[in-house]
Amino acid sequence: MNKTSVPSIDSIERQWFLVDAENQTLGRLATEVASVLRGKNKPSFTPHLDTGDFVVVVNADKIRVSGNKANQKLYRRHSGRPGGMKVETFQALQDRLPERIVEKAIKGMLPHNALGRQLFRKLKVYRGPEHPHSAQRPQTLQLNPAASSQ
């Protein structure tokens, strides 16, 4: 009888990855990053444990969307007060807080429970090419080389 091995928390090795979002499509980048955060790229993947790695996303202000989504895609938030709904287009949010677009896309692809919140803490998103995590020596993660050449 084969037994399924569950990795102990001490045996999980976490790496740091650097993703350049310049000229990447939002959804395609988000699925790959969510998979790495979750740990699905490792043979020790366990659905109920945090086996994933840290991911640093840079150049969030240069991410793109296909079609006319820049003008049509809406981001909504609510203050909790009556009449407190705020609606903003992709382009307006891109100008104001481009990090939030990437964070929201990736967060929606993580589990919607305590594990997902723990995984989301390992995501670091920055507007420009600089980030304060150079001491961790992140490895460059190639997502889709064909998309970046367009």
Swiss-Prot record:
Single annotated GO MF: mRNA binding
Keywords, alphabetical: Ribonucleoprotein, Ribosomal protein
GO terms (BP aspect): negative regulation of translation; translation
InterPro entries xref list: Ribosomal_uL13, Ribosomal_uL13_bac-type, Ribosomal_uL13_CS, Ribosomal_uL13_sf
Key word Ribosomal protein present: yes
Region described as Disordered: spans on this chain: 129-150
Keyword Cytoplasm listed: no
Annotated Polar residues bias: 136-150
Self-association and partners: Part of the 50S ribosomal subunit.
Family indicated by similarity: Belongs to the universal ribosomal protein uL13 family.
Job of this protein: This protein is one of the early assembly proteins of the 50S ribosomal subunit, although it is not seen to bind rRNA by itself. It is important during the early stages of 50S assembly.
Protein name: Large ribosomal subunit protein uL13
Biological source species: Prochlorococcus marinus (strain MIT 9313)
